[in-house]
Amino acid sequence: MNIILLGPPGAGKGTQAQRLVERHGMKQLSTGDMLRAAVKAETPVGLKAKAVMEAGQLVSDEIVSALIGDELDAMPAGQGAIFDGYPRTAPQAESLDAILESRGRKLDHVIELDVNEDALVERITGRYTCATCGKGYHDKFEKPAVEGTCDKCGGHEFKRRPDDNEETVRTRMAEYRAKTAPILPIYESRGIVSRVDGMADMDDVTAAIEAILAAR
């Protein structure tokens, strides 16, 4: 089974992808992670990508496609893949079809985590973590039992990510919509797109995704 998982930053894609990995033994293919790993390992594709990046240029679709092909070739035949961050354009969608078909695979599901922009802004801008142990909290939804003290380690210092601000979140939402708009109709025409309420409880989101996978 091969899945594309869509959703803006903060929608919970990472959590749901990890649960799919744990439950179904699938492999998460994140283009960013694959690129960094290939460059570090100095594979032929990695060296090509490194040269492009050092020249200050964007990594081409051809290089990304080669990375994905290499990853799929290294996977057992029966292992499913979760595509994260790819495809983002119509040409990339066509390329992915060709990559999968040449390896006897096909795309089974495109699952989009649907979110309310205002609610997502509230979710992201309110989150913070303990500077000592990393336990997560939220201004509204998950406060420490004792204000100013971490429930887990008793620490008193907390931190927020610098990009967890409203302007950045809304910019990322706009970028996400612009990037996914061209590819969704391609997959909708095949009847493989499903939408899940990404604002629901994480366990409910997982249950909804599992129901989609079980239905086909």
Swiss-Prot record:
Q: Where does Zn(2+) bind?
A: C130, C133, C150, C153
Query: What GO molecular functions are on record for this protein?
Result: adenylate kinase activity; ATP binding; zinc ion binding
Question: Which InterPro entries does the UniProt entry name for this protein?
Answer: Adenyl_kin_sub, Adenylat/UMP-CMP_kin, Adenylat_kinase_CS, Adenylate_kinase_lid-dom, ADK_active_lid_dom_sf, P-loop_NTPase
Q: Where is this region: NMP?
A: 30-59
Identify the EC number(s): 2.7.4.3
Q: Which annotated residues bind ATP?
A: G10, A11, G12, K13, G14, T15, R127, A200
| GO term, biological process aspect, one | AMP salvage
Entry GO terms, CC: cytoplasm
Q: Name one Pfam family in it.
A: ADK
The reactions it catalyses are:
AMP + ATP = 2 ADP
Biochemical pathway: Purine metabolism; AMP biosynthesis via salvage pathway; AMP from ADP: step 1/1
Q: Which UniProt keywords apply?
A: ATP-binding, Cytoplasm, Kinase, Metal-binding, Nucleotide biosynthesis, Nucleotide-binding, Transferase, Zinc
Main enzyme class = transferase
Summarizing the function annotation, the protein's role is: Catalyzes the reversible transfer of the terminal phosphate group between ATP and AMP. Plays an important role in cellular energy homeostasis and in adenine nucleotide metabolism.
Assembly and partners? Monomer.
Q: What is this protein called?
A: Adenylate kinase
Q: Look up and give the organism this protein is from.
A: Novosphingobium aromaticivorans (strain ATCC 700278 / DSM 12444 / CCUG 56034 / CIP 105152 / NBRC 16084 / F199)
Q: Which gene encodes it?
A: adk
